[in-house]
Amino acid sequence: MKKKVTIVTIILFLLVIVGSFGKVTDFIINLEWFKEIGYTSVYFTKLAAILKLMIPIFIIIYTGLWFYYKSIRKIIIKWNKVVEVNVKTEKLKKRVAIVIDVIASFFVAYFTSSVYWYRILQFTSGNSFNIKDPIFNLDVSFYVFRLPLIESLYGVMLLFLIFMAVLTVILYIVLSLRDRVYNRNIGGINISFKEFFKGLSDFAGRQFAIISGLIMFLVAVGYAIRSFNLVYSPRGVVYGGGYTDIHVSLVFYVIIIAAAIVSSVVIFTSIIKYKIKPIFVSIVAILILIIGQSITAEIVQNLIVKSNEKNLEAPYIKNNIEYTRKAFNIDKLSESNFPSSDSLTQADIDSNRDTVNNIKVNSVTPALEFYNQVQVVRYYYDFRDLDVDRYNIGGKYSEVFLAPREIDSKSLEGNADTWQNRHLIYTHGYGLVMSKVNSVTSEGQPNFVIKDIPPQNSTNLKITNPRIYYGEETDDYAIANNTLGEFDYPDGSKNKTNNYDGKGGIKANILNRLIFAINKRDSNFLLSENITSNSKILINRNIMDRLNKIAPFLSYDKDPYVVLSGGKLFWIVDAYTTSDRFPYSQPYNNVNYIRNSVKVVIDAVDGTTNFYIVDKNDPIANSYSKIFPGLFKDVSQVPKDIRSHFKYPEDLFSTQCNVLGKYHVTDTGVFYNSEDLWETAKNQKQINGEKGVNDASYFIMRLPGENKSEMVLMEYFNMKDKDNMSAIFGARMDGNNYGKLILYKLPTDKTVYSPYLFKQKLNQDPSISKEVSLWNTQGSSVQFGDTSIIPIKNSLLYVEPVYLRAQGKNSMPEVKRVIVSFGNKMVMANSIDEALNQIFNNSSNNQSETRTETGGTSTDSSNNKDKLKQAQDLYNQAVDAQKNGDWSKYGDYINKLGKTLDELNK
């Protein structure tokens, strides 16, 4: 028998060991990986924090349960009137109780610590915001760093005490039922409440008194927490405590807190003394206060506040405006009135050439489509996204589109989808493609300055190692520097290969190969002859997965962008510190505080990942730096060239746009009346297409009043539910101006065209609409590009690229014209310079004036007939060229047709 028990024990032990292999290998691999990237301290900080929280919780829970068990055990022995205790049985019960206690305490402690480990670190390391809340005059750090942990521990303790109370009652009921079965004359279930209470008091009066008293004390703690949470109240006209919350609810909460503390003492003593009435009175009093608070608050809100809302809520509206603007970092933006006059001259254009020369004629979506059509080279390459950035090219500060050519191993299909191909051969992407935003080829396509494999580079930018081992599409592990050779790029009928020499990766020694084989359940790690001791196992290669594994407490921008610096590629990811605990701040997407305090730079070759704090005034980022020493570097350590590519992130800007639509108003009366609401401007991409939200765009421009051009992220605002433009919002990002926000408020006494109204205006222009309609015939379609509305001096210049796309699966949109508008003048030309020349130097020939002269000339009828026939012939020739795919001839015919139609209009 003993032998059988030993065998069973051994088998169970082996099963536990085998079952834990996965967790053990996970731990070893994580440890090796954190060591490889230099962040072992970060990994152990979390483990240490979990243990620091877990050990005291385990001790408290274990001790509480053990003393509870011992006291209840004595009561049960006494209850059962046991004269002589069986020592062996008692020892067994004690061992079972210890095992259950240990297991229960471990799970409670582990769950609590693994969920709330970060909150205790914030509690002890939180920095002051130096901002006081307007109700309790507490620093905001109390709400952001300390209150969350207090709430968490309160919830755990309340659940634990309720569990203990319920367990005590259940034990009493079970024993009572058992005794009734044996007809013992004691209080049971079908008896009066008074008898039940006395029986429970006899059974475990002291234990139940302590538990009940503590529960009532926690009721007081709960209402204290609820008082602090009034700064997040949604009751009034704005988010945060309003008139009713402060003058009614808070008063009741204070009374309930005092009553609950008194009741906890009353309940404790009453249970000991077998008195029901004081307990009943205490509980009823608390319930009356709770119900009374709710009813009184509703009465005051509906009968008093609503009829005097504007005056009574004014101070709380002011709080909401002030704290929301602070939380979303729009309280220090630079506001100015922009006249949007029609006073722009050719001299103004000439003095702002750096702005004009960087106006986009390319647009993001069609450019990315073209990149993926002509530059992927092989089917397993992919351009996931198009990034916008600025580079000094040939001595000129230029805005460019660029995209990294990543390898997508998921595209390997059929016989090509093998373990060797996925993990040993196709290990990395190669190179990037770059084009200037301000120029296109004669066919209307992006004009590449870097293209092809190996890179054909017509810029002064150095490219020495453009490989991409870490990126947005590298979702699988790779075993680099193997004997097969890693595919680099196609070279005619052969392939160039590369052997990885980066410092990233875990060494593929026999022990690590064994660990990975167990962890991945893949024997290839051990059996492959192509893996050597010099090979490197690259894991967590997807840059977003990588960041979330290193620093999951940060939020990350959804659009990482690639930078060419020092001949290599680097990824820059914007990281955010966020909170939903900022007092009086209106939440947007479940966040009511956000800062772009951290920039992350990742080497695309070796995966080196550096976190830089760029906002030293952010208390949350500073607390992270204290919690994780060694993780964050100072912004002064960023290489100068990399830093010059830092951009203001679109996700943050979009959030600030949403907030600014309402919170640009600081007057409480105007805010209450919703008199001046804005919304992000709408736009239209196709003729008769649906109206959609206009996307924010990056521009290189010289802002009015500035001496130097710079990159600015800009968005346009309309009046709510109207198409008249009301403001232009911008974020600066070059040099010391990084992060400065500007707001140009437009005149309210005249119509300023929004992107959508501008589209309607050009659609109503006879000459432009005629030509666009002609293009938009069967066999092709017209699409609009990104609308640019550029402030120059005191005026607005509108620019719209016009794309033409032929029907067909592989057709690509091509820029055929550029529409430029200023004031009441609008022209469509082959280039921006040509359009500006027509507007400012040849106003007698511009299309706006042509429109006013239409029908005002006297011409010979036969001459008109010749012109009409010529127009018809040109149209037919254009259609034929279009069908043949000869877009160059098509453009020539359309140009001639336009001139002929202009002559007919004279």
Swiss-Prot record:
Primary location group: membrane
Any one annotated GO CC term: plasma membrane
Annotated compartments: Cell membrane
Pfam families assigned: UPF0182
InterPro entries according to UniProt: UPF0182
Transmembrane segments: 7-29, 47-69, 96-118, 153-175, 208-230, 250-272, 279-301
Region (Disordered) residue spans: 842-875
Keywords: Cell membrane, Membrane, Transmembrane, Transmembrane helix
Superkingdom of source: Bacteria
Low complexity: bias regions: 842-862
Membrane topology: Multi-pass membrane protein
Record family assignment: Belongs to the UPF0182 family.
HAMAP family named in the record: UPF0182
The protein's name: UPF0182 protein CA_C0010
